[in-house]
Amino acid sequence: MLLSAVNKFFLMILNKNIFFKVTVISLVIISFFLGYFLRENSTGGGLEFYELSWPIIQSFKKDFLFTIKNYGSFRDYTIPFSHILNAYINPFSNDVENFQLSVTVISFIIFLVFAQVCKKIFRQINIIDILLISSTILLLPFYRTSAFWGKNENYGWLFFILALYFFYEIKNDISKSSNNRHTINIILFCFTSSCALYARQALAFLPISYFLYLFFNNADKKIIITSIISFTIFAIPALLLILTWGNVFDLENNPNFFTWWIHPKHLLKNFPILLSFFGFYFLPILVIEFFNLEFKNFINKYLKSFLFALIIFVFLSQVNLLSYLGDYTRAGGAILKVNYLIQKNNYLLLLLFSSVGFSVLMRLFKEDVKNNATFLLPVLIIYCFPNLLYQEYVEPLILIIFFLVLKTNLQKIYFRNISFSNLIFISYFTVYLIGSIYFKHFAFDSYEKWKIFLNVQ
């Protein structure tokens, strides 16, 4: 049986088309590990590991209770779940280089997990094509930086992907009577989504989206009851932190956290930026759709909503309600930085991408409100809460949601000519990676140089 499978695999490789795809996958993987050994820092945030994450991990190894009680003094505004995992489960956390390599390997394994879940959902698609699609996350600058420098973010994506796998299983049986297998899937979803939340607090949208989905799809009451009980149990660590800190975050050492950093007042300010992120990550998918549809049909799908959003944004900019978009030195995303490179303090390019993002979201809402809106609306709200919206917050979130959550004809169009689609997809994010490396390693290798370019003191 094993010999037969091996022979089949090598016969596939002998096919020229398959051989080319395997070569591309191999090059992506090589670039990923090469990035680690060359100390790639394509988003500029890698070095903060030594000032933030590493001291916390070592403190946890020495004294758990002291570190918990004084966690806010480390200036980390997250729940310490990932640090605890690193301190007590990662066997390489005694040495910096070994630890960073271990996180790089874990991040590579996440790519394989992502591929496996994609294959589960898109069973008719060849495994080589699935691997090629999934390898895209290995090209994403923020994902790579987190991996190479031992940062925490990628743990959140691991648990998020696992949670979406169990949610996929739950959706398939949502109207059926509960059985042991179904109950186990519910408990595992609640566990993995809770871990995802503890690793990245913005992923709190997932339990919210889950319950909204159950409500709008008339889920069996046993599913809802089992979910509530499970989430209550998995919330116990958070309750213990609240008892220790007096809040969900350590406000004694960070008293302005809920007034300066996380607050609903930032919703409107961040909305154009978040829309531009959707436009940025969906652009290659739209290019693929453009080549698969007649020009008129493509334009009819998006033109009205695009022009509506663009007119609104241009009007708001003319009355100076969006002038703050020209004053960013941090955050805002790649498109805003490219916009500044073209013309300082200008944000027209960002508004164009925001309009594209708005148009895509309107299309997704129309296609399946019960599924797509229940996931996307909580994302749009929760991710607009921070004072500064960084692109790393949604990378690779938007791509994961597209392939594992959304119900859209864009997926069918992508798979219609999958070789061409993968070529566009991989090429787009390769250019993005190369641009990020050039920007951070050569053009502006320090924050001070970027501020000098912007004429900001």
Annotate each predicted stretch with a short phrase.
Residues 155-176, 185-193, 207, 216, ...:
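Specific aromatic-rich, kink-prone transmembrane helix
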Residues 101-124, 162, 166:
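Transmembrane-helix motifs of polytopic, lipid-linked glycan transferases
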Residues 38-48, 62-87, 96-107:
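Membrane-proximal lumenal/periplasmic loop motifs of glycosylation machinery
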Residues 133-134, 183-200, 207-212, 231-237, ...:
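Membrane-interface alpha helices of multi-pass inner-membrane proteins
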Residues 145-155, 390-391:
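Short acidic/glycine- and proline-prone juxtamembrane loop motifs at membrane-interface regions
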Residues 114-140, 157-158, 180, 184:
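Transmembrane-helix signature of polytopic, membrane-embedded enzymes
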Residues 197, 203, 208-213, 219-334, ...:
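Membrane-lumen/periplasm interface segments of specific transmembrane helices
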Residues 17-50, 234-245, 308-320, 380-383, ...:
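Transmembrane signal-anchor helices characteristic of membrane glycosylation enzymes that use polyprenol
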